[in-house]
Amino acid sequence: MNYTTQMDAAKRGIVTKEMEIVAKKECMEISKLMNLVATGQVAIPANKNHKSLSPEGVGQDLKTKINVNLGISKDCYNIDAELEKVKKAVEMKAEAIMDLSCYGKTEEFRRKLIDMSPAMIGTVPMYDAIGFYDKELKDITAEELLAVVEKHAKDGVDFMTIHCGINRETAEVFKRNPRLMNLVSRGGSLLFAWMQLNNKENPFYEHFDKVLDICEKYDVTISLGDACRPGCIEDSTDPSQIKELITLGELTKRAWERNVQIIIEGPGHMSLSEIKTNMLLEKKLCHNAPFYVLGPIVTDVAPGYDHITSAIGGAIAASFGADFLCYVTPAEHLRLPNIDDMKEGIIATKIAAHAADIAKGIPGARDWDNKMSRARRDLDWDTMFELAIDPEKAKRYRAESIPEDEHTCTMCGKMCAVRNMNKVMDGKNINILREDD
């Protein structure tokens, strides 16, 4: 193999098997895709050691992708339950799965996940460090943190969230500009605490070249984490968030010089009115690198319904340029999601992604909707169920309330506009009060 990473291959004019697969999935000319990868506008996360991967592209002119978070915690340590979630996420065609395990020895679960998953796999090595070394945060060294990154890369992780942007300068901006919710990024807050406790620079920022060495070796895409993402709408688009974003843009250029692929992570919680501006800022400051957003969650008052607040923000964000949506479940801010929560989160996020693809004019995005509309016009319920984003729920709702006229539903019955227009346009009587002829 005479290239190091997907970006290196693209710059050399080499078509990789991963590029071929992505181009086919996206109905895109391979030459266009290669140019987008070469310029960093598209990333194809594909670790050389992830043998079960079905690669996906993330970025400009591609379908909006979704990520599913799962993993074990101290309070919910059940590997089998998390593996069931993996199966469900794959069944529901999530393009990415992030293992956010934050307790104990996580290697067993991570390796099983990578072995069984065709979806691209992401991790946050910072979460793993405390359990991996069985040390308190303050006592972990910079070298040990980098060793965890290499361990995850060697295991086959396709992309890693690394919070390189919360350096000393960004930390000072944060301290000078108090927030209502401080820092809500788990990995970012751990790094900030490590820096404060040890009076040292962020090791991932200070040793960024060593991070690049590891990622180049295994072709790991760096998902540059946003430690300063807003955790409430009051804190959005503030000096800390913007200072970190500028730093991420600078690190992006350094990574691209080494042919390491980059994804930028973004907010977070913010008002609907700020979403477009934030998408434009990221694309400008980070040189059109792919943008990966958590939500954005557009109101802070809906615990139990944050899959909805997130889907609203995600649809708008993706329509204005976000490329990758992290799902949010109804359990957000409340507890570890169960498999039912996960399904609700996936469906909500897939709806947001698809709605955005229609708005962006992604080729073929409207075809799905047009097929559904034709089935509705024809009152073809079997085809409607086949095309539904959640066939199981659609079938269950219809079965719960059977209409007199099997072609309609119990909302309108024989006053169904579709039924009656079909009949009238065919020159037939609509017969609302009596049996059809």
From Swiss-Prot:
Enzyme Commission code: 4.1.99.17
GO biological process: thiamine biosynthetic process; thiamine diphosphate biosynthetic process
Pfam families membership: ThiC_Rad_SAM
Cofactor or coenzyme needed: [4Fe-4S] cluster
InterPro entries on file: ThiC (IPR037509), ThiC/Bza_core_dom (IPR038521), ThiC/BzaA/B (IPR002817)
Cofactor note: Binds 1 [4Fe-4S] cluster per subunit. The cluster is coordinated with 3 cysteines and an exchangeable S-adenosyl-L-methionine.
Function: Catalyzes the synthesis of the hydroxymethylpyrimidine phosphate (HMP-P) moiety of thiamine from aminoimidazole ribotide (AIR) in a radical S-adenosyl-L-methionine (SAM)-dependent reaction.
Gene3D superfamilies for this protein: 6.10.250.620, Radical SAM ThiC family, central domain (3.20.20.540)
Protein name: Phosphomethylpyrimidine synthase
Residues holding [4Fe-4S] cluster: C409, C412, C416
Family to which this protein belongs: Belongs to the ThiC family.
Key words of the record: 4Fe-4S, Iron, Iron-sulfur, Lyase, Metal-binding, S-adenosyl-L-methionine, Thiamine biosynthesis, Zinc
GO CC annotations on file: cytosol
Pathway in which this enzyme or protein is active: Cofactor biosynthesis; thiamine diphosphate biosynthesis
